[in-house]
Each structure stands twice: as structure tokens, then as C-alpha cells.
């Protein structure tokens, strides 16, 4: 029998023929895992060894999930959306993508969910691209100093705690103290800039509603529509009925939409209403995923939760487009306690805070800004020259009034100077009252604050302060060019001050008080006296009667 031999050349030729004839299968391969447990907006998934942190996963019913915990045995997934249809044993697939949202001018005037999907029934949104949610904040070398004003239209804020474009200014206070009202008024105040058509003045606004009632979000949208502000505003809505995952990512969605405009040279204003509810949602997610709790049961990285969000608000250098994103985060306190965990975290991250006092709000002082605690660390450099000149003594005067007011409650007799301070402080406090949806222009704020700090309201009854102010602004606008001069120059010169002084004196001669009496008796020549002199005269008359 002949011996069987194999020729190496034959083997090589057979292998080459096989390789040349081989065609790989066109069937795609994909990692598939299975739901081990699901509930409360959380799912534990097994069988996805290649999954990345923050990767998007898809469940059988199309619901998206965010890979949050990567353990050796399983993955902790935050379900983004309704989790009712997710059950044990269902398949889970990787997408190979991180969470991103569509961006572009098509979002102006629209209401979207935290995934960027329209929920206002107005059809699809035409996007200009996509932007990842976990984007890096601009570094120090690519930031520009804050030196342009972001006017709120509120006298109490623009005069004492000014905000600049690119600043992070915290609005903090108890529930029902007017925090959202300040943010909405600031958005409405940008209407004139938008209608000017000047890209350098226009501000695109984003309102992020986190854990709010659906009726509240609808009310905000209606208010913006009635004021004509919705055309330059985007609302990112995550109402109280949404899952904790949606409340967690909603602020990042709004920030991603705003960053697209910022890096294209646009100015953006974003309101986070409010970050307390985002922190609570993040706490519930972390506890359900068995992450170690810390102070007040919040996870250890809750500071990073807010810092990486708010650090994206900046005014960037020309190399990155020269745009800006101004952040107005809102935080709710309990019993005016600003030393709690989340409030102190956000205060340390932001560039200042506007503290709203519930006692002031209940006393009718609205906006209820507490002058003593409120501060703007960088906004002073952005304040217009005119407003800076007239408001220099306002904050000090009000602070002295507050301290003297509490002392006067227990003092039976005060000297004339103290009474004069109380008299002016009460009228300045009344002057700073402002109803909602009635923002002032910068030049109107200058005239109003100047008149208040220069004693033009001192001899008025408290009830006459606001009517006198409204009449004065109308008189100055109708009979002089003072408002136009301040608006065009942005300055308050000595000549403008002299002209305003004459205009105020002329208006005083025509003003009739609420009691029906003229403010100035034309039959008697007015005597020039100081408020202290007036108090001394009154005290002398009282002694004569005795």
C-alpha cells in the first residue's frame, strides 16, 4: 500500500483559495444583556461586559437608559422615561453612544423634554446638529472678564446686585417668595434687545423647569407668550410627574442647547428652576443604586453635580466665538436657612446671590430682596456708569435703615437725624417695590434711584411714593430729553443731573397727592430746609402744644 503524503504547496494553495473565497457574514453583531431587576426608575442589567460609563442603552420597548453604575456583575441603569413596560428578563442593547441632544435656532419658541423632543404639539424641530450633555466647561484661559450688563429690569437688583453677561447669579429663598417671578421678569426684559435686531444686544433665553407642577410650567409659558418673549425663549420641561432620571439630566439639556449658541458668538440667559429638586432626584437615584450616602443622605459627588453644570456659564474669548451664557440658578431654602447643604454648595459655586426674605415678602415688599445678604461679586464691573453713579449710597442707606428700624421698635425717643434716616429709608423701600411683568429700562432706573437717594420723596406720604415716581417718569419722558441722553451715552453727567433736578422741581409743582392736595403750595414761597430741620420744626410745634 502506497504511503499517504501531503504536499505543503497543496495545503498552502487550499488555504489561499479558502481565504479568497471567504465572505464575512453581513449580520451585525451586538452585545445583548438582560434585565435582572427593575423598578422605581432604576434597572439592573447583566451581560454587557463592554458597556461604557454614561453610555445609552435601549430596552425592548424603545425606552432609553443611562449606564450609571458599572459593577463586575451587573450595570445600574437610570431609565429615561416611563419604566412601566420594563420587566425582568427583557433584552437590553448597547448603542455605543453617549447622551446628546439636538441643538439650533429651531428650538426658539418651543417646549421640549430633557431629551430634546418637542412636547408642545407644534411639530418636529429642525436642528443644526447635536451636542453631548456632559460637555467640558471652558477653561480659564478661554474666558473673558464679565464687563457687559445683563439688565433684569428690576430696580432693586440692577442698582444693588447687578448682573453681567456670563455671570452665575443665584436666586435663593423660601418657597413662594418670588424667585421664579424675578427670573421670568429678567427674560421679559430682554424683549427690547431682541426687537432691536442687533446681534450684539440680542439674548436667547432658556427656562429649565425641574420638578415643577405641570400647571406652573403652562402658566410660565402663557406669561412669556403674552409678553411677546416666547419667540426668543426655549423651555426645557421636566415636570413633577417625570422620572428622577429626567429631572437629573434636564439642566444639562438646557446647558447643551445654550452652549451651542454661546460658541457661535451669541448671548444666552439660562434659568434653572430649581436645582434643589435636581439634587433630590440625584439623591434618590444614588440611593436606589446603593451608592454610599453622605450629609443629608446626598451622595459624595453632589457638589460636582452642580459645579460642572454652572461652570459652563461663562463669557468666552473671541477664540471660542466671543459669546456668553448667563446662569440664574434657583435654590429653595427651608425656614430661610441658607446654611443647609445644597444652598451653601451653590453659593460657593456662583458669583453672587439674591436672597429673598419671606418676612419681607409677607410684608408686601416685592421683590423681597434682603439687602444685607444679597451680593454680586463680579457684576459691579458690568454695571452701566449711569446706574453706578446714582446707586452708590443706596445699599448703605437701606442697610442702615434696616438696623435702625429694628432699634426704633424699642426706643421711645429718637434724635432728628435718626428720624430723618428712618423717613428716607421707608420711602426708598417703597420706591424699590415693583409689580411683576413691569420691567424698567436702564434710564428709568437711573432717574428713579437718583430721585430717591437725593431726598425728592422725603416729604411725600408713603402712599404717594410710587404714584409720584410714575408721574415723574412720564413727565421727564414727555418734556425733556434726559432719558434719551442717559440711554445713548450710558452715563450720568453733571449737566444731566442739573437738568433732572430742575425737571423734578417742575413736576413737584404740578403733582397732586392722593389726599387731593397740591404737593407744593404756590401761595407760599417754599423754604429750603433739610429733612433734619423739618423734624426739628415738628418737634418744636409739638412742645408748644403741650
Swiss-Prot record:
Any one Gene Ontology molecular-function term assigned to this protein's record: proton-transporting ATP synthase activity, rotational mechanism
SUPFAM superfamilies found in the cross-reference section: C-terminal domain of alpha and beta subunits of F1 ATP synthase, N-terminal domain of alpha and beta subunits of F1 ATP synthase, P-loop containing nucleoside triphosphate hydrolases
Keyword set includes Nucleotide-binding: yes
GO CC annotation: plasma membrane; proton-transporting ATP synthase complex
Keywords of this entry: ATP synthesis, ATP-binding, Cell membrane, CF(1), Hydrogen ion transport, Ion transport, Membrane, Nucleotide-binding, Translocase, Transport
Topology class, membrane: Peripheral membrane protein
Alphabetical list of Gene3D superfamilies matching this protein: 2.40.30.20, ATP synthase alpha/beta chain, C-terminal domain (1.20.150.20), P-loop containing nucleotide triphosphate hydrolases (3.40.50.300)
Composition bias, Basic and acidic residues: 535-546
EC number, as in UniProt: 7.1.2.2
Disordered: annotated segments: 520-546
Lineage: Bacteria, Bacillati, Actinomycetota, Actinomycetes, Bifidobacteriales
The keyword ATP-binding appears for this protein: yes
Binding site for ATP: 173-180
Name of the protein in question: ATP synthase subunit alpha
EC class: translocase
Pfam families for this protein: ATP-synt_ab, ATP-synt_ab_C, ATP-synt_ab_N
InterPro entries for this protein: ATP_synth_asu-like_sf (IPR023366), ATP_synth_asu_C (IPR000793), ATP_synth_asu_C_sf (IPR038376), ATP_synth_F1_a_nt-bd_dom (IPR033732), ATP_synth_F1_asu (IPR005294), ATPase_a/bsu_AS (IPR020003), ATPase_F1/V1/A1_a/bsu_N (IPR004100), ATPase_F1/V1/A1_a/bsu_N_sf (IPR036121)
Catalytic activity: ATP + H2O + 4 H(+)(in) = ADP + phosphate + 5 H(+)(out)
Family: Belongs to the ATPase alpha/beta chains family.
Domain of life according to the entry: Bacteria
Site label Required for activity, positions: 374
PANTHER family in the cross-refs: ATP SYNTHASE SUBUNIT ALPHA, MITOCHONDRIAL (PTHR48082:SF2)
Transmembrane residue ranges: none
